[in-house]
Amino acid sequence: MGVYVDAADILVQAGVSAPSAAESAWADTVEDAIEGAIAHALDDGAFTPSTSQTAALTAAAMLDALALFEMRSAPHGVLSITPDGEVARLGADPLRASRTVLYPINPGIG
């Protein structure tokens, strides 16, 4: 169980009532990815959010986790094909919602 998101909560919020092994594993991966990205943005403990910032960050982290969970089955973004026929897809910041909460805590995250 993460500080800001939990794999089981991700599955509930995604509407997955009877997750497959693959869905459960993906939810665990998403939890680790979001938690790791937030820890990195907080400089691995060098910056500590206030109580109100923690509440906002928890909500934003769940939105980010849901977006990342759904991205696996519904890839989106800009798709380009190179002259050699290779697919190039632009990604998105996995902390889109959380970044606005994290920036006042650690302005150095850019």
Language-model features, listed with the residues they occupy:
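Divalent metal-cofactor coordination and adjacent catalytic microenvironments
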Residues: M1-G110
